[in-house]
């Protein structure tokens, strides 16, 4: 009888922990990236519109990624290109860079960005909820820790897939086509405000090889959280 009661209590406790744990619930969907949005900055050249929308501030970052990325040293910028001209253009990630006070910010892959920021925040939330169960956590920790670990791994995988799905990939941009996605960069430690931040990129015209340049300067951004 005691074993049966312990089993039921363990199941109840594990369910309570998972129910209380903050799940990964971003407010942005992939389909929304292709729609026209209000950018932070926009520039046009050779019939191609290039816009950048910041997701560095805490409110926008939490909307898109359910976490304050900048507090973990990750900068997310949504880049959108729309070809309103008559030529085909190639867009390569290697031709894009983020600059701040004259220094290039290192690229982060979607997986690295996810691991550095959101998965860390989720693990912290999960542990906090687990410990918050008090003495029950001590009594049943082998079962709750095992279940929590499995659950966390599942959520971490979903977070990584989300970051990858929303990331910007190089593409051939034909007339009347749109390319859009997030680029992730590593921020220096301890920043509270981003100043002199810009995104520089080149696109390559397929027919002639001409390479229009874009430099989009963003306003100062408060990332103090």
State each model region's role.
Residues 1-21:
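Sec-dependent bacterial lipoprotein signal peptides
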Residues 21-225:
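Conserved functional micro-motifs across diverse proteins
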């Amino acid at each position: 009888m005691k074993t049966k009661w312990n089993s039921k209590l363990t199941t109840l406790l594990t369910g309570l922990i998972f129910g209380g744990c903050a799940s990964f619930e971003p407010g942005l969907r992939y389909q929304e990236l292709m729609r026209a949005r209000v950018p932070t900055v926009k520039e046009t050249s050779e019939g191609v519109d290039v816009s950048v929308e910041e997701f560095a501030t805490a409110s926008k970052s939490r909307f898109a990624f359910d976490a304050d990325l900048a507090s973990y040293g990750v900068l997310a910028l949504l880049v959108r290109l729309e070809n309103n001209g008559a030529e085909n253009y190639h867009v390569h990630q290697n031709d894009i860079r983020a600059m701040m006070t004259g220094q290039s910010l290192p690229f982060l892959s979607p997986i690295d960005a996810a691991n550095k920021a959101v998965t860390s925040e989720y693990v912290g939330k999960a542990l906090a909820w687990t410990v918050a169960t008090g003495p029950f956590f001590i009594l049943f920790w082998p079962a709750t820790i095992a279940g929590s670990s499995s659950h966390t791994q599942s959520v971490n995988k979903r977070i990584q897939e989300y970051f990858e799905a929303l990331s910007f990939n190089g593409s051939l941009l034909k007339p009347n086509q749109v390319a859009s996605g997030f680029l992730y960069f590593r921020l220096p430690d301890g920043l509270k405000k981003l100043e002199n931040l810009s995104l520089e990129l080149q696109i390559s015209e397929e027919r002639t090889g001409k390479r229009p340049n874009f430099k989009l300067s963003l306003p100062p951004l408060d990332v103090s959280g």
